UniProtKB/Swiss-Prot annotation:
PANTHER family: DNA DAMAGE-REPAIR_TOLERATION PROTEIN DRT102, RIBOSE-5-PHOSPHATE ISOMERASE B. This is Galactose-6-phosphate isomerase subunit LacB 1. It comes from Streptococcus pyogenes serotype M1. Belongs to the LacAB/RpiB family. Keywords: Isomerase, Lactose metabolism. The keyword Acyltransferase does not apply. It catalyses: aldehydo-D-galactose 6-phosphate = keto-D-tagatose 6-phosphate. It comes from the Bacteria. One of its GO terms (biological process) is galactose catabolic process. The keyword Isomerase applies. One of its GO terms (molecular function) is galactose-6-phosphate isomerase activity. Pathway: Carbohydrate metabolism; D-galactose 6-phosphate degradation; D-tagatose 6-phosphate from D-galactose 6-phosphate: step 1/1. Heteromultimeric protein consisting of LacA and LacB. It is an enzyme of class 5 (isomerase).
């Protein structure tokens, strides 16, 4: 199984620890970045993880930023992604079993590294429980998606990266 993983600069260490854990369990890890502590913007890496999953490069995805809120919102904008921001086992299992989540999001400064690893392991092993109700709910959620052509523009995030470079965002 292939797992795509991405983060922002604030939680690079946490992402690397999760990546090492996944590799130790025998999973192939697609590291979508970031790779160091150079200041960057989390939507870039949420988008990369989401695209890896919907394009079939990865079976599932993991997104981590400081609180998890930003990167999880970003990855959920990729059509076909169903991501849940979780901090506990119950929420993660519900997301996979009932909503067929294909990405899981974390706040790397909120949820401890060992707990994240335990939750991710359980999430990967959990099975979607297909029911008519679940299928209808997922179809309704998918119906809300819309594709915006400008997202394919390689300069889509340039405006925000320039603001980062000018120091207009805080960590």
């Amino acid at each position: 199984m292939k797992i795509a993983i991405g983060c922002d600069h604030i939680v690079t260490n946490e992402k690397m620890a999760v990546s090492d854990f996944l590799k130790s369990k025998g999973y192939d890890v697609i590291d979508c970045g970031t790779y160091d502590h150079t200041r960057t913007h989390y939507p870039i890496f949420g988008k990369k993880v989401g695209e890896a999953v919907v394009n079939g490069q990865a079976d599932l995805g993991v997104c981590i930023c400081g609180t998890g809120v930003g990167i999880n919102n970003a990855v959920n904008k990729v059509p076909g992604i169903r991501s849940a921001l979780v901090r506990d086992m119950t929420t993660a299992l519900y997301a996979k079993e009932e909503l067929n989540a294909n990405v899981i999001g974390f706040g790397g400064k909120i949820t401890g590294e060992l707990l994240m690893c335990d939750i991710i392991d359980a999430f990967i092993k959990a099975e979607y429980k297909e029911t008519e109700e679940n299928k209808k709910l997922i179809a309704k959620i998918a119906h809300l998606e819309s594709h915006h052509a400008n997202q394919e523009d390689p300069d889509f995030f340039t405006e925000f990266l320039e603001k980062w470079d000018r120091g207009e965002y805080h960590d």
